[in-house]
Protein backbone atom coordinates (compact mmCIF):
# COMPACT_ATOMS: atom_id res chain seq x y z
CA UNK A 1 0.00 0.00 0.00
CA UNK A 2 1.45 3.39 -1.06
CA UNK A 3 0.20 6.60 0.56
CA UNK A 4 -1.16 9.11 -1.95
CA UNK A 5 -3.58 11.35 -0.07
CA UNK A 6 -3.34 10.73 3.70
CA UNK A 7 -6.77 12.04 4.70
CA UNK A 8 -8.48 9.92 2.03
CA UNK A 9 -6.39 6.76 1.83
CA UNK A 10 -7.92 3.62 3.25
CA UNK A 11 -7.20 -0.09 3.02
CA UNK A 12 -9.94 -2.50 2.01
CA UNK A 13 -10.31 -6.06 0.71
CA UNK A 14 -10.52 -7.12 -2.94
CA UNK A 15 -12.10 -10.58 -3.08
CA UNK A 16 -14.11 -12.85 -5.35
CA UNK A 17 -17.17 -12.75 -3.11
CA UNK A 18 -18.85 -10.57 -0.51
CA UNK A 19 -18.41 -12.99 2.39
CA UNK A 20 -14.68 -13.22 1.68
CA UNK A 21 -14.55 -9.41 1.89
CA UNK A 22 -16.12 -9.60 5.34
CA UNK A 23 -13.51 -12.11 6.50
CA UNK A 24 -10.59 -10.03 5.24
CA UNK A 25 -12.08 -6.81 6.64
CA UNK A 26 -12.41 -8.42 10.07
CA UNK A 27 -8.65 -8.99 10.01
CA UNK A 28 -7.83 -5.50 8.73
CA UNK A 29 -10.08 -3.80 11.28
CA UNK A 30 -8.64 -2.28 14.43
CA UNK A 31 -6.49 0.55 15.70
CA UNK A 32 -2.78 0.64 14.93
CA UNK A 33 -0.58 2.47 17.48
CA UNK A 34 1.74 3.41 14.60
CA UNK A 35 -1.14 5.06 12.70
CA UNK A 36 -2.61 8.06 14.50
CA UNK A 37 -5.54 8.20 12.08
CA UNK A 38 -6.77 4.67 12.84
CA UNK A 39 -9.82 4.15 15.06
CA UNK A 40 -10.77 1.31 17.41
CA UNK A 41 -14.24 0.85 15.91
CA UNK A 42 -16.11 -2.46 16.22
CA UNK A 43 -16.84 -4.59 13.16
CA UNK A 44 -19.88 -6.85 13.34
CA UNK A 45 -20.97 -9.15 10.52
CA UNK A 46 -23.28 -12.15 10.65
CA UNK A 47 -23.78 -13.96 7.35
CA UNK A 48 -26.96 -15.59 8.70
CA UNK A 49 -28.56 -12.45 10.12
CA UNK A 50 -30.71 -11.55 7.10
CA UNK A 51 -31.60 -8.06 5.91
CA UNK A 52 -35.27 -7.63 6.78
CA UNK A 53 -36.39 -4.11 7.56
CA UNK A 54 -33.67 -2.27 5.65
CA UNK A 55 -34.42 0.89 3.70
CA UNK A 56 -32.47 1.18 0.45
CA UNK A 57 -32.16 4.44 -1.47
CA UNK A 58 -31.16 5.31 -5.03
CA UNK A 59 -30.59 8.49 -7.02
CA UNK A 60 -33.02 8.46 -10.00
CA UNK A 61 -30.52 10.05 -12.41
CA UNK A 62 -28.11 7.17 -11.77
CA UNK A 63 -30.57 4.85 -13.47
CA UNK A 64 -31.34 7.19 -16.36
CA UNK A 65 -30.36 7.02 -20.01
CA UNK A 66 -26.70 6.17 -19.37
CA UNK A 67 -27.45 3.26 -17.04
CA UNK A 68 -26.74 -0.19 -18.44
CA UNK A 69 -28.93 -3.28 -18.49
CA UNK A 70 -26.77 -4.63 -15.67
CA UNK A 71 -27.45 -1.52 -13.57
CA UNK A 72 -31.21 -1.90 -14.01
CA UNK A 73 -31.05 -5.64 -13.29
CA UNK A 74 -29.22 -4.94 -10.02
CA UNK A 75 -31.86 -2.42 -8.91
CA UNK A 76 -34.62 -4.88 -9.82
CA UNK A 77 -32.87 -7.61 -7.82
CA UNK A 78 -32.61 -5.25 -4.84
CA UNK A 79 -36.36 -4.63 -5.01
CA UNK A 80 -37.00 -8.38 -4.98
CA UNK A 81 -35.17 -8.74 -1.67
CA UNK A 82 -38.29 -7.43 0.04
CA UNK A 83 -36.95 -4.25 1.59
CA UNK A 84 -38.22 -0.73 1.00
CA UNK A 85 -36.50 0.89 -2.00
CA UNK A 86 -36.97 4.66 -2.25
CA UNK A 87 -35.78 7.60 -4.35
CA UNK A 88 -33.41 9.97 -2.56
CA UNK A 89 -31.55 13.17 -3.39
CA UNK A 90 -28.43 15.05 -2.36
CA UNK A 91 -28.07 18.82 -1.98
CA UNK A 92 -26.53 20.79 -4.85
CA UNK A 93 -22.90 21.36 -3.90
CA UNK A 94 -19.72 21.84 -5.97
CA UNK A 95 -18.59 18.29 -5.21
CA UNK A 96 -16.10 18.27 -8.08
CA UNK A 97 -14.05 21.00 -6.42
CA UNK A 98 -12.98 18.48 -3.78
CA UNK A 99 -10.56 17.01 -6.34
CA UNK A 100 -8.32 20.01 -5.74
CA UNK A 101 -8.01 19.05 -2.07
CA UNK A 102 -6.93 15.56 -3.08
CA UNK A 103 -4.37 16.93 -5.55
CA UNK A 104 -2.95 19.31 -2.94
CA UNK A 105 -2.49 16.49 -0.41
CA UNK A 106 -0.95 14.24 -3.06
CA UNK A 107 1.42 17.01 -4.16
CA UNK A 108 2.51 17.52 -0.54
CA UNK A 109 3.08 13.78 -0.10
CA UNK A 110 5.27 13.64 -3.21
CA UNK A 111 6.91 17.05 -2.85
CA UNK A 112 10.42 15.57 -2.90
CA UNK A 113 9.64 13.74 -6.13
CA UNK A 114 8.55 16.99 -7.78
CA UNK A 115 11.36 19.24 -6.51
CA UNK A 116 14.04 16.72 -7.48
CA UNK A 117 12.55 16.24 -10.97
CA UNK A 118 12.45 12.51 -10.30
CA UNK A 119 8.84 12.57 -11.46
CA UNK A 120 10.38 12.67 -14.95
CA UNK A 121 11.10 8.97 -14.41
CA UNK A 122 7.39 8.13 -14.27
CA UNK A 123 6.25 6.40 -17.42
CA UNK A 124 3.00 8.34 -17.88
CA UNK A 125 3.75 11.98 -18.71
CA UNK A 126 0.47 13.22 -20.23
CA UNK A 127 -1.24 16.48 -19.30
CA UNK A 128 -3.46 14.67 -16.79
CA UNK A 129 -0.67 12.45 -15.41
CA UNK A 130 0.63 12.75 -11.84
CA UNK A 131 3.77 14.82 -12.60
CA UNK A 132 1.65 17.64 -14.02
CA UNK A 133 -1.19 17.37 -11.49
CA UNK A 134 1.37 17.62 -8.67
CA UNK A 135 2.75 20.82 -10.18
CA UNK A 136 -0.69 22.34 -10.78
CA UNK A 137 -1.55 21.83 -7.12
CA UNK A 138 1.23 24.24 -6.12
CA UNK A 139 -0.86 27.09 -7.53
CA UNK A 140 -3.67 26.56 -4.99
CA UNK A 141 -3.64 29.25 -2.30
CA UNK A 142 -4.04 28.85 1.46
CA UNK A 143 -7.44 30.51 1.10
CA UNK A 144 -8.42 27.90 -1.51
CA UNK A 145 -7.47 25.14 0.91
CA UNK A 146 -9.52 26.62 3.77
CA UNK A 147 -12.57 26.95 1.52
CA UNK A 148 -12.12 23.38 0.29
CA UNK A 149 -12.01 22.12 3.89
CA UNK A 150 -15.25 23.99 4.55
CA UNK A 151 -16.79 22.35 1.49
CA UNK A 152 -15.62 18.96 2.71
CA UNK A 153 -17.47 19.51 5.98
CA UNK A 154 -20.64 20.46 4.07
CA UNK A 155 -20.35 17.22 2.10
CA UNK A 156 -19.95 15.26 5.36
CA UNK A 157 -23.20 16.77 6.62
CA UNK A 158 -24.93 16.04 3.30
CA UNK A 159 -24.03 12.34 3.38
CA UNK A 160 -24.88 12.02 7.06
CA UNK A 161 -28.29 13.48 6.20
CA UNK A 162 -28.72 10.98 3.38
CA UNK A 163 -27.92 7.99 5.58
CA UNK A 164 -30.26 9.26 8.28
CA UNK A 165 -33.03 8.53 5.74
CA UNK A 166 -31.80 5.18 4.38
CA UNK A 167 -29.62 2.31 5.54
CA UNK A 168 -27.76 2.11 2.23
CA UNK A 169 -27.58 3.61 -1.25
CA UNK A 170 -27.41 1.52 -4.43
CA UNK A 171 -26.18 2.61 -7.83
CA UNK A 172 -23.50 2.36 -10.51
CA UNK A 173 -20.04 3.39 -9.37
CA UNK A 174 -20.50 6.82 -10.99
CA UNK A 175 -23.74 7.52 -9.08
CA UNK A 176 -23.94 11.31 -8.84
CA UNK A 177 -21.12 12.64 -6.65
CA UNK A 178 -20.87 9.47 -4.55
CA UNK A 179 -17.45 8.08 -5.62
CA UNK A 180 -15.81 11.43 -4.94
CA UNK A 181 -17.94 12.51 -1.98
CA UNK A 182 -17.68 9.24 -0.05
CA UNK A 183 -13.91 9.25 -0.44
CA UNK A 184 -13.80 12.58 1.35
CA UNK A 185 -16.30 11.63 4.06
CA UNK A 186 -15.18 8.05 4.70
CA UNK A 187 -18.59 6.44 4.15
CA UNK A 188 -17.97 2.80 3.19
CA UNK A 189 -18.63 1.45 -0.29
CA UNK A 190 -19.02 -2.15 -1.44
CA UNK A 191 -18.53 -2.58 -5.18
CA UNK A 192 -19.59 -6.03 -6.34
CA UNK A 193 -20.05 -7.97 -9.53
CA UNK A 194 -23.55 -7.63 -10.94
CA UNK A 195 -23.41 -9.05 -14.47
CA UNK A 196 -21.61 -8.95 -17.80
CA UNK A 197 -21.58 -6.88 -20.99
CA UNK A 198 -19.97 -7.48 -24.37
CA UNK A 199 -17.39 -4.67 -24.58
CA UNK A 200 -14.24 -3.82 -26.48
CA UNK A 201 -10.98 -3.03 -24.72
CA UNK A 202 -11.11 0.27 -22.86
CA UNK A 203 -8.35 2.90 -22.97
CA UNK A 204 -6.31 3.87 -19.89
CA UNK A 205 -8.17 6.21 -17.52
CA UNK A 206 -6.88 8.96 -15.27
CA UNK A 207 -7.47 9.02 -11.51
CA UNK A 208 -10.38 11.44 -11.97
CA UNK A 209 -12.24 9.23 -14.48
CA UNK A 210 -14.82 6.75 -13.21
CA UNK A 211 -15.93 5.37 -16.57
CA UNK A 212 -14.11 5.28 -19.89
CA UNK A 213 -15.71 4.62 -23.25
CA UNK A 214 -14.81 1.36 -24.97
CA UNK A 215 -12.66 1.62 -28.07
CA UNK A 216 -13.52 -0.22 -31.26
CA UNK A 217 -12.12 -3.70 -31.51
CA UNK A 218 -12.73 -7.29 -30.53
CA UNK A 219 -15.43 -7.52 -27.90
CA UNK A 220 -15.24 -9.71 -24.81
CA UNK A 221 -17.59 -10.62 -21.98
CA UNK A 222 -16.60 -8.05 -19.37
CA UNK A 223 -17.81 -8.15 -15.75
CA UNK A 224 -19.81 -5.14 -14.56
CA UNK A 225 -20.38 -3.99 -11.00
CA UNK A 226 -22.92 -2.27 -8.80
CA UNK A 227 -22.09 -0.21 -5.73
CA UNK A 228 -23.59 -0.06 -2.26
CA UNK A 229 -22.77 2.80 0.12
CA UNK A 230 -23.59 2.76 3.81
CA UNK A 231 -23.28 4.54 7.13
CA UNK A 232 -19.99 5.20 8.87
CA UNK A 233 -18.72 2.15 10.78
CA UNK A 234 -21.72 0.10 9.61
CA UNK A 235 -19.90 -2.16 7.17
CA UNK A 236 -21.54 -5.27 8.63
CA UNK A 237 -24.99 -4.19 7.49
CA UNK A 238 -23.63 -3.18 4.09
CA UNK A 239 -21.97 -6.57 3.65
CA UNK A 240 -25.13 -8.42 4.71
CA UNK A 241 -27.08 -6.51 2.06
CA UNK A 242 -24.35 -7.23 -0.49
CA UNK A 243 -24.41 -10.93 0.36
CA UNK A 244 -28.17 -11.09 -0.24
CA UNK A 245 -27.88 -9.11 -3.47
CA UNK A 246 -25.01 -11.30 -4.65
CA UNK A 247 -27.19 -14.40 -4.19
CA UNK A 248 -30.11 -12.75 -6.01
CA UNK A 249 -27.95 -11.76 -8.99
CA UNK A 250 -26.38 -15.22 -9.27
CA UNK A 251 -23.20 -14.19 -11.10
CA UNK A 252 -20.53 -14.30 -8.38
CA UNK A 253 -19.58 -17.90 -9.12
CA UNK A 254 -18.68 -17.16 -12.75
CA UNK A 255 -14.89 -16.88 -12.94
CA UNK A 256 -12.68 -15.89 -15.89
CA UNK A 257 -11.35 -18.66 -18.09
CA UNK A 258 -7.59 -19.00 -17.64
Regions found by a protein language model. Give the residues of each.
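Short, well-ordered beta-strand elements within core beta-sheets of diverse protein domains
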Residues: 9-16, 135-140, 228-230
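Short connector loops at secondary-structure junctions
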Residues: 83-100, 134
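Short helix-loop capping/hinge segments that flank enzyme active sites or metal/cofactor-binding pockets
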Residues: 50-59, 100-156, 201-226
Amino acid sequence: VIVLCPSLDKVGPICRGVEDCAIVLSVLNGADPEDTSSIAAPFRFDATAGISGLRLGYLPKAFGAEATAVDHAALAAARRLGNEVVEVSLPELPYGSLKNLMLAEAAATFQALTLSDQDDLLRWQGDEAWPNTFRKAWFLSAVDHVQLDRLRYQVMLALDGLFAEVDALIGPLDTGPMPLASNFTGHPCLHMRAGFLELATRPPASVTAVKSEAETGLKSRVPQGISLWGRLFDEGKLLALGLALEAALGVAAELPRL
